[in-house]
Amino acid sequence: MAGRILDWRKELERWLRPFLERLGHKTRRRMCPVYIWGLIGPGDRKSIQPMAERIALGAYDQLHHFVSAGVWDVAPVETELLIQADKLVGGRDAVLVIDDTAVLKKGTHSVGVAPQYCSALGKIANCQTLVSLTLAHGEVPVMAAMRLFLPESWTDDRARLKRAGVPVEYRAARTKPEVALAEIDRVIAAGVRFGCIVADAGYGLSARFRQGLTARKLSWAVGIPRHVKVYPVDVQMIRPVARRGRPPQRIPDTLSVAAEDVLTTAKWQNISWRTGTKGKLRARFAAVRVRVADGSPQRIKDKTHQHLPGEQAWLIGEHRASGERKYYLANLPAKTDLRALAATIKARWVCEQAHQQLKEELGLDHFEGRSWQGLHRHALMTMIAYAFLQYRRLATARSKNLPK
């Protein structure tokens, strides 16, 4: 056992070299592997004190300084993580999954903590929310980025932001989709390769998020609530006959309709998109081409304000065996078949696996500090640890497939 532990520690040190070069000072280069050893190694608690007691007696002050108090820039290390993630799973067949994960907290002093929706509990709870970006190929995810979302109770309180050490560039109020778009820009700037962005309805509901992805010339497939409005793909803009005065504005020749209503007459098919541990995963799917009602708002005829037709997209419905129904939009090409659409929208499940492992095995939610800097450094170390584990997983799989 001791020999195996020593072997993976040596392997970790070799793999970490590009990261250590970005850290600069020799003390930081020495503490980084120690911290990551502590995250990966045995032990129920992955906060600084118990890790120091297990792996580096007397190193508490140095580990604390490395993560919470030391003056060093995380940006170069974050960029290196993106580079390594791309090497592991990047490519045209990869997806970039946008999601968020909650870290439960007590009190009011930890940066970003507030009563807000906690996905793990399915209800409002006192927690921090980290917007996450996961690069994945098939069933192999690599957590590539995390950024803390700040609720209004924080962005409206300058003194509170300053006490928690929130950098000036992150103090303005931003929605989770806006945080995600900024992180996507960082991912793109690092040269990370992926074919499609996928996200749940928490992000897909945002027209600005979808439009932001399209403006960046990205393919996307996102969940939406059932009431999101769409138009027929062949909707036409017409100019009503004016009785007097200025010519009226052009309006759609039909009204927009809720997504769930559009699919009631669609052709539904049983589709298998992946083989899981218990066999093929199946559900009933239907898809039609539509124009999304996310253009400018305008009063149409004698109706209330509606949004004008936006870009063309696929509207996709899913009927699960449990009776649950889900709806999605995707700007994938019109020639995309139903199975490919289903496989793309279901690709986001891998981020849930990554979130679970980051918390249960690597201690993402064990950080006990209160500062912005400390939280993001700890999260970064857990992501690097996770990337190393995925590196070993892929290396092991390759070695098993080598000819004997």
Regions found by a protein language model. Name each.
Residues 160-240:
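Domain-level cores of phosphate- or acyl-group-handling catalytic modules
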Residues 68-152, 157-158, 162-163, 297-304:
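Active-site-proximal, Lys/Arg-enriched surface segment
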Residues 330, 336-345, 360-377, 396-399:
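Short, solvent-exposed helix-loop connector elements
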Residues 389-404:
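Conserved nucleotidyltransferase catalytic core and NTase-mimicking acidic/glycine-rich helix/loop elements
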Residues 10-13, 122, 136-165, 169-173, ...:
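An anionic, glycine-rich sequence signature occurring as long contiguous blocks
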Residues 51, 92-106, 133, 196-205, ...:
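Short, conserved catalytic/metal-binding motifs centered on acidic residues
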Residues 23-39, 43-108, 115, 221, ...:
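Electropositive nucleic-acid engagement tracts
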Residues 1-24:
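Basic, low-complexity segments
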